[in-house]
Amino acid sequence: MCERAARLCRAGAHRLLREPPPQGRALGGLLRWVGARMGEPRAPLVPDIPSADPGPGPAASRGGTAVILDIFRRADKNDDGKLSLEEFQLFFADGVLNEKELEGLFHTIDSDNTNHVDTKELCDYFVEHMGDYEDVLASLETLNHSVLKAMGYTKKVYEGGSNVDQFVTRFLLKETANQIQSLLSSVESAVEAIEEQTSQIRQDHCKPSHAVNESRYGGPTPPYIPNHKLVAPEPMKSLPVATGEPKEDGLEGQISRLAELIGRLESKTLSFDLQQRLSDEEGTNMHLQLVRQEMAVCPEQLSEFLDSLRQYLRSTAEERNCFHVAAVRMADGLTFVIYEFWETEEEWKRHLQSPVCKAFRHVKVDTLSQPEALSQISVPAAWCTSGRD
């Protein structure tokens, strides 16, 4: 199916490129000049590198390197041409490799021991492991330029072509989109299969710990009504609690305690008075994993970030092992803090592999003005148990 779609896509692109430009009617030579300018490729992915520079290694002559370089440039948040360990972990964290493994990979790529890797060095490393994906990425480079030319041609036809010319161009454009979407669906299916397999492997490794956690809880985690509204509270002000009728007695008190805890975290006055709040006789030796993400957003990317954040909060709140998730928008309007309560650290790491988390991570790479600040801490589960004062 993929080969047939690729052949049809290439045939359609060739037909579209071989189609002679329509004769100008109303604007004559001026229209043809504008159409030709629109048909020129824009912002090529291959960077302008002086020919005298031989490049760092064999990657310079390999196909697909331009796409990889373009991807890695997105991870370079401060545009200094290199990635720090924090930027590296933020961009590549997927819940499969832990922090130590990512750090080890970082130092492997950092062959000159400078505690940073430049995008070219990173590209060279991945090129050596591309395999058959070299042809795929090289084709993407060609497709990128071909699509840009086709869009310019389409604009020219619609400005000066006949109804028949417009009909043919419209048909070719839609069919090209269908064929590309068919290829994309095949790739997405492969991605989903790999993610499902990876998630199952990690779940099998973590089964003993989950059994202990369930027995200590004495039952499943109490349900709650998630709050899907993103608000902008004043500084040092806790989040509003979820609305709606609680499903169990004591649920409203749970959410109130969580909101109070978040408020204390935001004002940086959190203290653990275990003698006052907990006692071993009550079986309070179980903990929840609290994950805190602080993000500074670029002003021009704020709208895109907010849309993705709302989707992330909705999806995360529906996960069974996420006890609570909430977000705070700080007074400057561009700083956001997300708090997530997970049953175990392994559940949170498994969440990092989910499609919604990966999608949100890619949006953060494009919209944040600096790498996010991520921290985690164990919180006594008794604070979130019904019937506790």
From Swiss-Prot:
Q: Which annotated residues bind Ca(2+) 2?
A: D110, D112, T114, H116, E121
Please state, per the UniProt record, what induces or represses the expression of this protein: Up-regulated by PAX6.
Domain EF-hand residue range list: 63-98, 99-132
Which molecular-function annotations from GO does this UniProt entry contain? A2A adenosine receptor binding; calcium ion binding; type 5 metabotropic glutamate receptor binding
Q: In which tissues is it expressed?
A: Expressed in the iris, in the ciliary margin of the retina and in the inner portion of the neural retina. Expressed in the spinal dorsal horn with especially strong expression in lamina IIi; found in excitory synaptic boutons (at protein level).
- List residues traversing the bilayer: none
Which residues carry the post-translational modification Asymmetric dimethylarginine, per the record?
R42
**Has UniProt tagged this entry with the keyword Iron-sulfur?**
no
Supply the name of the protein: N-terminal EF-hand calcium-binding protein 2
